[in-house]
Regions:
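N-terminal secretory signal peptides
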Residues: 1-40, 65-67
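Non-catalytic accessory regions flanking glycosidase/transglycosidase catalytic cores in CAZymes
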Residues: 41, 46-57, 61-294, 299-308, ...
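Active-site cores of enzymes that catalyze phosphoryl transfer or operate on phosphate-rich substrates
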Residues: 305-311, 326-331
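Active-site His/acidic residue clusters
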Residues: 313-328, 377
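Acidic/histidine-rich catalytic cores and adjacent linkers
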Residues: 380
Length: 581
């Protein structure tokens, strides 16, 4: 083991030539190569992802920066970042897809004693409102590539029941766009609407914006008014399709074909509403054979017409991905760091090529742990309504990694403006319902802490931490490039108007307590407002409706407030410290 010193700050351009070298040396993929391969069934492809491995790597800012061969407590040196703006709260968003029980029996269950007059589950609405989720993506996801938004508006008695071909599920359309907008208003969140770029035309996508955002006087705006919504919805954020590079996607497109379609749609949408924030489809993941090449080709077609580019990633603790090693698994958020840097590099490359003054931001609008309910009956609705699909049961180690993902998103929040935990309820979600109530899974807590305590701007940190090695160890070579991973992962935020700060700390050490000393250079915490940790002796422990408190936060002995603070971090833990200034 060694002590690793690394710098943690929000992403601000290239920090290492390593990223550029990786981009240059990736094997090129001719446009359409993936399409010419034999057709791949969506569920078969999803099942096969486990054998590809996640591309785990020590991030460039962890490489070659001050390794020392001494042992000792971890230290974090914290300071303000001059000129830094507050991070966008949308980086802590979530996702609701017409998939499984996410919508029906999740947020919407008319006739239930737990539902209100509109059919919204009041217990779920209360949980989401308490979380203060800033933005929710809807309606998909794979679902959106075969979705006709007109089926889900107007009188409910006239809405058709159709077969969703993405998940082989009966879709009643009893919950649609206007219902979602009403639900967003009830829970206090902002809508992020997805568009059908699979079977859908540019004309239909533009009509959707007109329906939602134009006040009156046109075919589609007046249709909305006849549906009982006199005022426009004013939806600002839109996804231009979903995972259009994927062979599992309805209406899969080649990169330049998609880029041209996105450009055309965006130009027309901005005539209706120039203030729209439009997100183009990036590569579906680092496992794709066209990863980064897809992003470049898409942006070469539509760079100046879009505002953001999407990223998606899911992780799991399996034999193929991590060798079933908790230590390797808990380092996977560093792969998310690398993923962000590589895609940002492509965006900046295209910006330079096109001599554009616009700098794209990133939308990490699908991220989570997902590896158990990934194939077979877990992904096939078998032509039924609201089937149990993708219902992962999350344990302690899953929650710790979700905490790591939160840290990664926050420290990259000057480039990642929007991010969505996929998903919100029942489907790979922190909340699960039955007919009697709602359960908080283990992953609820790190997400809730970030929403509650992380405010203002992300601070610069310089961290010294003892490390442990991550090596391929017989796994696929692309899974883990040899490197050292810090036991302690830290992020800090500062809300000066609110006179508060927060520390979010992951201890990856699965056996030993770790000590962390935090030194504040230009901030003086005066009191500890809260100090909690998520830990336990069993990494595989999980919550159930019968035992809902197996994995819950515990009070942690608070450090003495001041410009030098020492924390005792339990093994296998994610900790929050809320400070008053």
């Amino acid at each position: 083991m060694s002590t690793l010193e690394y710098h943690v700050g929000v992403l601000g351009g290239y920090e290492s030539m390593a990223t550029m070298n990786r981009l240059r040396t990736r094997a090129p993929h001719a446009e359409g190569t993936f399409n010419r391969e034999a057709a791949v069934d969506r569920r078969t492809f999803l099942a096969g992802l486990g054998s590809t491995g996640a591309l785990l790597a020590v991030r460039p800012w962890l490489e070659g920066i001050g390794y020392a061969q001494t042992r000792g407590p971890a230290r974090a040196f914290v300071r303000k970042r001059p000129g830094a703006a507050d991070f966008d709260r949308r980086v802590l968003g979530s996702f609701l897809e017409h998939l499984g029980r996410a919508v029906y029996t999740g947020v919407y269950q008319p006739g239930s004693p737990l539902a209100d007059a509109k059919g919204f589950r009041t217990d779920v609405a209360r949980e989401v409102k308490e979380l203060a989720v800033p933005i929710v993506r809807y309606p998909g996801g794979n679902f959106v590539s075969g979705y006709n938004w007109l089926d889900g508006v107007g009188p409910k008695a006239q809405r058709p029941t159709v077969l969703d071909r993405a998940w082989n599920t009966l879709e009643s359309n009893q919950f649609g766009t206007n219902d979602f907008i009403d639900w967003c208003a009830q829970v206090g969140t902002e809508p992020l609407l997805g568009m059908n770029f699979g079977t859908g035309s540019v004309e239909a996508a533009v009509a959707y914006v007109e329906y939602c955002n134009l006040p009156r006087g046109t075919r589609w705006s007046d249709l909305r008014r006849t549906h009982g919504y006199e005022q426009p919805h004013g939806v600002k954020y839109w996804c231009l399709g979903n995972e259009m590079d994927g062979p599992w996607q309805i209406g899969q497109l080649q990169a330049r074909e998609y880029g041209r379609k996105a450009r055309d749609a965006a130009k027309q949408m901005r005539v209706i509403d120039p203030k729209l924030q439009l997100i183009a489809c990036g590569s579906s993941g680092t496992f794709m054979p066209t990863y980064l090449a897809w992003d470049r080709e898409v942006l070469e077609e539509c760079y100046d017409q879009v505002d953001g580019l999407s990223l998606h990633a899911y992780y799991g603790n399996t034999k193929e991905w991590s060798g079933n090693s908790a230590s390797r698994y808990l380092a996977m958020n560093l792969d998310m760091d690398r993923h962000i840097h590589e895609v940002a590099a492509v965006c900046d490359y295209v910006q330079g090529l096109q001599r554009s003054s616009k700098r794209l931001w990133l939308s990490f609008d699908e991220w989570n742990v997902w590896y158990r309910a990934r194939d077979g009956q877990a992904t096939d609705g078998r032509g039924t309504a609201a089937p149990h699909l993708l219902e992962e049961v999350y344990n302690l180690e899953d929650a710790l990694l979700v905490g790591g993902f939160v840290n990664t998103l926050l420290r990259n929040s000057d480039r990642v403006r929007v991010a969505c935990l996929a998903q919100l309820v029942n489907v790979i979600a922190p909340l699960v319902t039955n007919d009697q109530g709602v359960l908080r899974q283990s992953t609820y807590y790190p997400y809730a802490w970030a929403l509650r305590y992380a405010r203002g701007r992300v601070l610069d940190l310089r961290v010294e931490s003892e490390t442990y090695p991550i090596t391929p160890a017989g796994l696929q070579a692309d899974f883990a490039r040899t490197g050292d991973v810090p036991f302690v992962d830290v992020v800090a935020t500062l809300d000066e108007p609110g006179h508060q700060a927060a520390l979010l700390v992951l201890n990856r050490d699965t056996t030993d307590e770790r000590e962390l000393t935090v030194e504040w250079s230009d901030i003086a915490p005066k009191r500890v407002l809260a100090c909690q940790t998520l830990t336990g002796s069993d990494l595989k422990a999980f919550n159930t409706f019968d035992a809902p408190r197996r994995v819950v936060p515990q009070a942690l002995t608070a450090p003495a407030a001041g410009d030098r603070m020492t924390l005792k971090l339990p093994p296998r833990s994610y900790t929050v410290v809320h400070l008053g200034l």
